[in-house]
């Protein structure tokens, strides 16, 4: 079902939505293209029915039907749900925004669309000609790859080898070329490799998710308004992980414009806590803690940064599946752990905390998140 109602996506709807005028009902064709069209079906006499060959091009879109014109129109308007069982001890209400329910199962679907669309509108990329190049921890790459596939772009992605196997498979399934980089170098190594590929690839363009204003812009125009609308403006605290900085910066700015009293709290891995004065380092919370401060991160919009360890994030992600029925990724576990910690503060009694769950758990089956379950399943024998 087409779910986008925000103005940011209005440009997607083109004149193709207008049903061409039907001058002769006998020639009107609906449904999948066919090689033959009978134009005398109205006749009831014994006269023979004559048929004519028609074009195999798709028929015009039928106006008024609740059908998305293409996959990009499925992005956004994700639901929110209260956390009831992992939030024991919290004096605040905690509601999660399930970005795991995007068409490609992560919040990065939004920026995959927005960055490609923005570059097209600026005339700097062309379908069938431009090769897109981008460093990714996986989810942004997937968000870019499915839009690139739908619009006819070649795409080359660089990714630390420490990211989950599911990410590799999904990216290849969308036709992306994937280059793995040294995991010890983190995202910085992936960025350096992408820049190297960019220089030697003709007609290539890097979308630069860490620096591209179209990243926080789409969250300001869509994710923020969605949270405000779904909470009817009653959100008191917004919690999100810090990766590219796009989600927390865009949503945080929108919410603070609507209500300056809204608190915006970011999350970073304890093992790579550069925003808290620490040093970059390896960690297990895929998608967070890039090891540097992205240009897209608006430090001024955040009221606080909370550290969550990889161990705590993994454990909470497991609890979300077992106790809430929400199969989400490790960064969602980190977000939930931080939200519950904030919710236990006495001063937050009765407040509403909105937290973003960035991705679906099925993308992490080969990771540490499900290691024990995976080993158990591998050792199962038929009875």
UniProtKB/Swiss-Prot annotation:
Subunit structure: Homodimer.
Keyword Ribosomal protein: no
Biological pathway: Amino-acid biosynthesis; L-cysteine biosynthesis; L-cysteine from L-serine: step 2/2
UniProt-annotated binding residues for pyridoxal 5'-phosphate: 139, 243-247, 331
GO cellular component: chloroplast stroma; chromoplast; cytoplasm
Gene name, Swiss-Prot/TrEMBL: CYSK
GO biological process terms, semicolon-separated: cysteine biosynthetic process from serine; double fertilization forming a zygote and endosperm; pollen tube growth
Residue stretch of the organelle transit peptide: 1-52
Name of the featured protein: Cysteine synthase, chloroplastic/chromoplastic
UniProt keyword annotations, A-Z: Amino-acid biosynthesis, Chloroplast, Chromoplast, Cysteine biosynthesis, Plastid, Pyridoxal phosphate, Transferase, Transit peptide
């Amino acid at each position: 079902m087409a779910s986008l109602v925000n103005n940011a996506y209005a440009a997607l709807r083109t004149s193709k939505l207008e049903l061409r005028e039907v001058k002769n009902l006998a020639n009107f064709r609906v449904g999948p293209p066919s090689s033959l069209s009978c134009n005398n079906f109205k006749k009831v006499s014994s006269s023979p029915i004559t048929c004519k060959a028609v074009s195999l091009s798709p028929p015009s879109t039928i106006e008024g039907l609740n059908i998305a014109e293409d996959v990009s129109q499925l992005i956004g308007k994700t639901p929110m749900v209260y956390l009831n069982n992992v939030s024991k001890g919290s004096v605040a209400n905690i509601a999660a925004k399930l970005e795991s329910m995007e068409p490609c199962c992560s919040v990065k679907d939004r920026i995959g669309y927005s960055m490609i669309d923005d570059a097209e509108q600026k005339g700097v990329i062309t379908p069938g000609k431009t090769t897109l190049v981008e460093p990714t921890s996986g989810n942004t790459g997937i968000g870019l790859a499915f839009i690139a596939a739908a619009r006819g772009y070649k795409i080359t992605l660089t990714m630390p080898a420490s990211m989950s196997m599911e990410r590799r498979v999904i990216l290849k399934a969308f036709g992306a070329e994937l280059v793995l980089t040294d995991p010890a170098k983190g995202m910085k190594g992936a960025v350096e490799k992408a820049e190297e590929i960019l220089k030697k690839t003709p007609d290539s363009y890097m979308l630069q998710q860490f620096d591209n204003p179209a990243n926080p812009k789409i969250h300001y125009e869509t994710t923020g308004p969605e949270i405000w609308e779904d909470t009817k403006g009653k959100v008191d605290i917004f919690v999100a992980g810090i990766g590219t900085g796009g989600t927390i910066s865009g949503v945080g700015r929108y919410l603070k414009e609507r209500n300056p009293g809204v608190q915006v709290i970011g999350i970073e891995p304890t093992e790579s806590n550069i925003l808290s004065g620490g040093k970059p380092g390896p960690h297990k919370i895929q998608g967070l803690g890039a090891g540097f401060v992205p240009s897209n991160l608006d430090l001024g919009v955040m009221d606080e940064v909370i550290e969550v360890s990889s161990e705590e994030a993994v454990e909470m992600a497991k609890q979300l599946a077992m106790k809430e029925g929400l199969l989400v990724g490790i960064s969602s576990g980190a977000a939930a752990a931080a939200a519950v910690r904030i919710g236990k503060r006495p001063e937050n009694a009765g407040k509403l905390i909105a937290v973003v769950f960035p991705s679906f758990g099925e993308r992490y089956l080969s990771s540490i998140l499900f290691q024990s379950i995976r080993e158990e399943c591998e050792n199962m024998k038929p009875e």
